[in-house]
């Protein structure tokens, strides 16, 4: 049904937003680690 499809799409888009945020945070952490290694 259309309602189910809408729910799935909303859930998928929310999932992508969360994933994007998590990947962004991991990217910051790995840059910090890389900078820390360079500084030693």
Swiss-Prot record:
The lineage of its organism: Eukaryota, Metazoa, Cnidaria, Anthozoa, Hexacorallia. InterPro entries: Anemon_actinoporin-like (IPR009104), Cytolysin/lectin (IPR015926). Pore-forming protein that forms cations-selective hydrophilic pores of around 1 nm and causes cardiac stimulation and cytolysis. Pore formation is a multi-step process that involves specific recognition of membrane sphingomyelin (but neither cholesterol nor phosphatidylcholine) using aromatic rich region and adjacent phosphocholine (POC) binding site, firm binding to the membrane (mainly driven by hydrophobic interactions) accompanied by the transfer of the N-terminal region to the lipid-water interface and finally pore formation after oligomerization of monomers. Keywords: Cleavage on pair of basic residues, Cytolysis, Ion transport, Membrane, Nematocyst, Secreted, Target cell membrane, Target membrane, Toxin, Transmembrane, Transport. One of its GO terms (cellular component) is other organism cell membrane. One of its GO terms (biological process) is cytolysis in another organism. This is Cytolysin SmT-1. Residues 11-30 are annotated as: N-terminal region. Belongs to the actinoporin family. Sea anemone subfamily. Its main location: secreted. One of its GO terms (molecular function) is toxin activity. Octamer or nonamer in membranes. Monomer in the soluble state. Composed of a long N-terminal alpha-helix and a core region rich in beta-sheet structures. Before the pore formation, the alpha-helix binds the lipid membrane, partitions into the lipid-water interface and stabilizes the monomeric molecule on the membrane. Finally, it traverses the bilayer, thus forming the transmembrane pore. The keyword S-adenosyl-L-methionine does not apply. Pfam families: Anemone_cytotox (PF06369). Gene3D superfamilies: Cytolysin/lectin. Residues 3-12 are annotated as: Plays an important role in the hemolytic activity. It comes from the Eukaryota. The keyword Secreted applies. It is found in: Secreted; Nematocyst; Target cell membrane.
């Amino acid at each position: 049904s259309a309602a189910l499809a809408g729910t799935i799409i909303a859930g998928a888009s929310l999932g992508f937003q969360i994933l994007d945020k998590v990947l962004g945070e991991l990217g910051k952490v790995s840059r910090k680690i890389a900078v820390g290694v360079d500084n030693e």
